[in-house]
Amino acid sequence: MDLGIAGKTALVAASTGGLGLAVARALAAEGVRVAIVGRRRDRAKEIVAELQAAYGTGSFGTSGFDAVAIEADLTTPEGIESAVEQTIADLGPIDILVLNGPGPKPGAAATLSSEDIAAAFDLLVKPQHALVSHVLPGMRERRWGRILAIGSSGVTAPLPNLAVSNTGRAALAGYLKTLAAEVALDEVTVNLLLPGRIATERVTQLDHAAAKRRGTTLEDIQLESRKTIPARRYGEPAEFGAPAAFLCSAPASYITGVALRCDGGLIRSL
């Protein structure tokens, strides 16, 4: 299927690793001009070199694939503004915005402080809102845009010992669902992609933390976790990138306001 997005420009937040990188790779494979944004400049440059070697600058024509490395702290207003401005300067107006961010610290709901609640919004809501605010007006004016947020299965099935994440991501989901209805007439879609247990560094860190907390081994934790997944395995990052690219595509123009699960059947609710 031709996804119809070759030559479009995407800013992919926190894309120097994990799920953000998986989405960036999937978009690059479709000929999208991709801004690799993160705090690790050297890593961002490595990824750009990798993508250019794989797909070649302009391999989809004069308006085709390219990539740029942008060092920015997207938890700050200055970092957000810089990332948006540099993406536009180097690659053109932003057609696709992929919202993503670092996972907050683990912790139980019963022991959350007011500072923890504030941190959930500072990390998982305010930066994403700021990015949307910078990019959305141009999308509406051009009457084409895709906003995709990388969420968590905790949005629909709160995860144990991740109270800050569950709180902040649920708030973001509410904002995005509301926004989707407001901008649909402008041909801008807004969606959320919910990963289950995808084999990323973040998931491994959480498994290590669980093993330490319970006094067992990483292997035992992962075996136990796999048993809760109907597919009986963790997903591969590329298996997350593929549906992400589709939700950012031209054929997905009638899909908006959804929270799509990519979880191997992990979430049991309807």
What are these model-derived regions, one by one?
Residues P137, A181-E182, S253:
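Alpha-helical segment proximal to the catalytic Tyr-Lys
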Residues A157, A245, T256-L270:
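Short C-terminal tail/terminal secondary-structure segment
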